[in-house]
């Protein structure tokens, strides 16, 4: 009985604390049409203090969505266009020698912002990618002999283009694992595309106003962890994760030769957190199995290694996750 009272209290608190989500969504919907999945995943990354990798063909509003989110939240925003000639100093900053004062001064790079858009991250060499990914992990940057903390909230949203892979540097598996979510953006529906086409032909500038403060976001990042998760949901998450490592124990022996490595503990941590965030953005104080299923592909598709055999059979990590989710009993 006491547990039920607690859940009711949590639910009331979450409903109150998540009221800003509707404001944020309506502000983003002024500009972004028909990409609810992408907007939801950006909000999950923001609330979960995670970083997001967006993948999709050009022209699907990836950059626009990220830019709009930063405008709707009164925080600083910077964009880094990754190119083959980019240097780590172009991302994190460098030391400049002042001749008049005979000393070095620090010039901070674009990574010093609340929202950092890393556009076409797979176009820069590994050492540049590493500089950004280290900042993402450590939430700090070292320039010369000085270490600088990055401002909270700090969210990196990286984009990559799945086509036109010539001249690209694919992110190593260990680096990709640092992204909380990898979201694949699809084409809009025909009705949505009609609205997009009309809006662009009218050529009227839409002004996005800040509707949420940074302080409110930071409070929400703490409150989201209070969303209630039953032990049965925890077991459900762990069954999904362990099925990527030991499929034969879950009546999925046919998957064993297709998986070169399963999801790491980061997978279970991020799946649980993303499910809590999904419940939060839906104004609910407890996690249900549908929350887990709504985020499982975004959390795990970049955390499972597929074998040469899987590639030969034209199987992707998404196909493997689909089989696992269909097999694991829902609590």
Residue ranges and their predicted role:
Residues 1-14, 247-331:
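C-terminal engagement/docking regions of AAA+ P-loop ATPases
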Residues 10-18, 31, 168, 182-254, ...:
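Conserved C-terminal "switch" segment of AAA+ ATPases
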Residues 14-60, 242:
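Pre-Walker A (pre-P-loop) alpha-helix and adjacent loop at the N terminus of AAA/AAA+ ATPase modules
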Residues 46-83:
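Walker A/P-loop
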Residues 57, 91, 159:
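P-loop (Walker A) phosphate-binding loop of NTP-binding proteins
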